[in-house]
């Protein structure tokens, strides 16, 4: 049996991080977590590009352009959508999820979903570096593994 896995060494690899400015008090923590993991796994500072977009809805469009340009080995999408009193949360969460998934399926580079969709600010804070870890860190680890897996396929 041949088992293929992605290694967790990212030396010489380039990563793009697309991050939403909306709920920036959370997304700043997600991006810090992602950058920390990338650097711990040998990604040079100059090989990390950060693209700020206004909100989560804009993430897929920018991620698609980056994935198509061929400059980066992986794209990490980070954002935070917190449920409010209107259905807006449902629409945004669904569309950003579908958009990132669609790009990931059509792209030759891994596109990783690291967008929080939470029912409360407390849940978002927990997932941005407190009780529930840092989902930005998790997304970066997934990106490293998937970049290496894509190379092995």
UniProtKB/Swiss-Prot annotation:
The active site is at residue 88. Pathway: Cofactor biosynthesis; riboflavin biosynthesis; riboflavin from 2-hydroxy-3-oxobutyl phosphate and 5-amino-6-(D-ribitylamino)uracil: step 1/2. 5-amino-6-(D-ribitylamino)uracil binds at residues 22, 56-58, 80-82, 113. Keywords: Riboflavin biosynthesis, Transferase. The keyword Signal does not apply. SUPFAM superfamilies: Lumazine synthase (SSF52121). NCBIfam families: lumazine-synth, PRK00061.1-4. Catalyzes the formation of 6,7-dimethyl-8-ribityllumazine by condensation of 5-amino-6-(D-ribitylamino)uracil with 3,4-dihydroxy-2-butanone 4-phosphate. This is the penultimate step in the biosynthesis of riboflavin. This is 6,7-dimethyl-8-ribityllumazine synthase. It comes from Endomicrobium trichonymphae. The gene is ribH.
């Amino acid at each position: 049996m041949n088992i293929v896995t992605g290694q967790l060494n990212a030396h010489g690899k380039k990563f793009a991080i697309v991050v939403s400015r909306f709920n920036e008090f959370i997304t700043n923590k997600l991006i810090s977590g992602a950058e920390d993991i990338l650097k711990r796994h040998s990604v040079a500072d100059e090989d990390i590009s950060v693209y700020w977009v206004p909100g989560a809805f804009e993430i897929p469009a920018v991620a698609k352009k980056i994935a198509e340009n061929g400059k980066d080995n992986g794209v990490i999408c980070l954002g935070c959508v917190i449920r409010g009193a209107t259905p807006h949360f449902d629409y945004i969460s669904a569309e950003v999820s579908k958009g990132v998934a669609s790009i990931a399926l059509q792209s030759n580079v891994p596109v990783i979903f690291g967008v929080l969709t939470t029912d409360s600010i407390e849940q978002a804070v927990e997932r941005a570096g407190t009780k529930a870890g840092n989902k930005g860190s998790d997304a970066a680890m997934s990106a490293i593994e998937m970049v290496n897996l894509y190379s092995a396929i």
